[in-house]
């Protein structure tokens, strides 16, 4: 049994454009204002103002920041840009997570921190954005330009005269690094960094010396040149050969299926993937980290393919198929449920953003995923067998038993009520943990956003990501599902949500510990100190801004809280603490946890 299909994920990103947001919609780079319409006064032609203008022209209108002595002057000049809003965060980690969430909705995000103490604090969030193929611009206020090349020891360092420690850390989690410590090439370095982030759909690092941000320079007073990203093109002969080989393979199959993966977004191929589904009639499934990339109301949609923890009847159809197209998959230990997928390489067509591998046959390079799917959809033979088989075996899910009056709330009952809240005007943010599995079961209506961080899986990510996503998409009401353990990591930026008038509904799942860790390997370290979470949020609120909190233990209290949050408190940040039993978890987490535990505990190979 070969479970390693599609694991060749080490190629560089290949999209020629900014990352598209959730549900496969397209985020475009904001067009620069025509140069004839812009007059830049020399006093405004500072390095800081130039950087601010270029961020706006790239599509960033909100920057998440934490002040520090090396970036204060730079922050002044960013604030002076009328089209740029500076959002102060409580810590650098959350600023990075917020930029991550912002990029998921808007297509590009940015954060500003100070040298080393800020840079190394935000590094974890930047690594997560790198793993998720998000264009994120991390700006650091750096040392005075006169201190480079000297033997001086500065504060915020590890006590050595070498200032490159921060840069070396960022080199592994960004696709480009710019150290701006002189004015002559600052214009070129900044533009190269931002355009590289957009082109590669990965984070970049820009360090700006603290004494340069306020200085004008003639290169910054020029008419702005729009960012121009030449579109990448497929090799026509290679594309034709790949389509021919794929058609030959698929047309021999009896019951082929399609499975979408997380790289559909970075490849800008969500719409083309749906076109192929329409033309082929194949059963259509999505990997968990691609949920929301295609419309779940598609007539041939059969759910989430996640091996042993797939939605009902989905894995049976996928794994029994004699041909499967995997579009942009990432097969890691989490997505493969401890490497237990029952897939065979000889049955798989693996389509990555820039190449196609047909079963055990050839790999075709220099081919864009979207071009491949569109050409294939024009010529593929329609075959609905797999979907018809799914339709035959499908049994609608039974509704959870209604809780008796004053009976403790159950998690499956809770999500029955969450389902009713979803619409095109909502978005779901799911924290690492049991929320992954419970939110996967939600049926997303058209236009409903959905995000979670599966590849990196950093607990606490969702607080900052919720802040950033809500700031980028004020037209949507974000529903965030956060476990108590994760919430304790990053709770501070509830404050920033309130300062910015956000109207998110946060469901705090209070079950007394790190539930996902418990199911992988239990121990006393997975038990956490219980907090008065509603009291904490009330204290953060402190009478400033619009905030409403509730603590629910029973179904009737949950229904009442949801009603209040969606009616009279619809313009408030709403925080609903849901008390659940510590062992009330999804059956999918129980299965997944045991398989991941087995994968983690494999003995060393013999030497």
Curated annotation (Swiss-Prot):
Expression by tissue: Highly expressed in seeds, and at lower levels in roots and siliques.
Thiamine pyrophosphate binding: region residues: 434-516
UniProt keyword annotation of Hydrolase present: no
Assigned keywords, A-Z: Decarboxylase, Lyase, Magnesium, Metal-binding, Pyruvate, Stress response, Thiamine pyrophosphate
Cofactor binding summary note: Binds 1 metal ion per subunit. Binds 1 thiamine pyrophosphate per subunit.
Family named by the database record: Belongs to the TPP enzyme family.
UniProt-listed PANTHER family: PYRUVATE DECARBOXYLASE, PYRUVATE DECARBOXYLASE 1
Protein's recorded name: Pyruvate decarboxylase 1
Organism: Arabidopsis thaliana (Mouse-ear cress)
Gene coding for it: PDC1
């Amino acid at each position: 049994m070969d479970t390693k299909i599609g694991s060749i994920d080490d190629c560089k990103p290949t999209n020629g454009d900014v990352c598209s947001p959730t549900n496969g919609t397209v985020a475009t780079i904001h067009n620069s204002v025509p140069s004839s319409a812009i007059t830049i006064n020399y006093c405004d032609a500072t390095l800081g103002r130039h950087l601010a203008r270029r961020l706006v022209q790239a599509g960033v209108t909100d920057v998440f920041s934490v002040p520090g002595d090396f970036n204060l002057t730079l922050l002044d000049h960013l604030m002076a840009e009328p089209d740029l809003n500076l959002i102060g965060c409580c810590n650098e980690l959350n600023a990075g997570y917020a930029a991550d969430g912002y990029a998921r909705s808007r297509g590009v995000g940015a954060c500003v921190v100070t040298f080393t103490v800020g840079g190394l604090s935000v590094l974890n969030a930047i690594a997560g954005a790198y793993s998720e193929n998000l264009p994120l611009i991390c700006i650091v206020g750096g040392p005075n330009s006169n201190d480079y090349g000297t033997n001086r020891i500065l504060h915020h360092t590890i006590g050595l005269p070498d200032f490159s420690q921060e840069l070396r850390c960022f080199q592994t989690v960004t696709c480009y690094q710019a150290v701006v410590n002189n004015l002559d090439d600052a214009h070129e370095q900044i533009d190269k960094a931002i355009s590289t982030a957009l082109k590669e759909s990965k984070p970049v690092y820009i360090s700006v010396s603290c004494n340069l941000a306020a200085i004008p320079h003639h290169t910054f007073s020029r008419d702005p040149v729009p960012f121009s990203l030449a579109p990448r093109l497929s090799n026509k002969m290679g594309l034709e050969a790949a389509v021919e080989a794929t058609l030959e393979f698929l047309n021999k199959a009896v019951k082929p299926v399609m499975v979408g993966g997380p790289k559909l977004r970075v490849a800008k191929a969500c719409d083309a993937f749906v076109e192929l589904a329409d033309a082929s009639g194949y059963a259509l499934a999505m990997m968990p980290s691609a949920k929301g990339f295609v419309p779940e109301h598609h007539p041939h949609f059969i759910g989430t393919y996640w091996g042993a923890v797939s939605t009902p009847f989905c894995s049976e159809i996928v794994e029994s198929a004699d041909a499967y197209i995997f579009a942009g998959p990432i097969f890691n230990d989490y997505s493969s449920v401890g490497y237990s997928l029952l897939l065979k390489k000889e049955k798989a067509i693996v389509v990555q953003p820039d190449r196609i591998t047909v079963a055990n046959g050839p790999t075709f390079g220099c081919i864009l995923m979207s071009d491949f799917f569109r050409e294939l959809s024009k010529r593929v033979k329609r075959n609905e067998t797999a979907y018809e088989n799914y339709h035959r075996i499908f049994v609608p899910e039974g509704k959870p038993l209604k809780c008796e009056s004053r009976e403790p709330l159950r998690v499956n009952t809770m999500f029955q009520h969450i389902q009713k809240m979803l619409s095109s005007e909502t978005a779901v943010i799911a924290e690492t943990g049991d929320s992954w599995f419970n939110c996967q079961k939600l049926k997303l209506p058209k236009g409903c956003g959905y995000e979670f961080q599966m590849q990196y899986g950093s607990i606490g990510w969702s607080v900052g990501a919720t802040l950033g996503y809500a700031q980028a998409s004020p037209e949507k009401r974000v529903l965030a599902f956060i476990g108590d353990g994760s919430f304790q990591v990053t709770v501070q930026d509830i404050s920033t949500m309130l300062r910015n008038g956000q109207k998110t509904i946060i469901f705090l799942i209070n079950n007394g510990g790190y539930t996902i860790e418990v199911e992988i390997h239990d121990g006393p370290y997975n038990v956490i100190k219980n907090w008065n979470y509603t009291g904490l949020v009330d204290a953060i609120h402190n009478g400033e801004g619009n905030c409403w909190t509730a603590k629910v233990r029973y179904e009737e209290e949950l229904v009442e809280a949801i009603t209040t949050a969606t009616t009279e408190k619809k313009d408030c940040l709403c925080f609903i603490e849901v008390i659940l039993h510590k062992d009330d978890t999804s059956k999918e987490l129980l299965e997944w946890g045991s398989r991941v535990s087995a994968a983690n505990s494999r003995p060393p190979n013999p030497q």
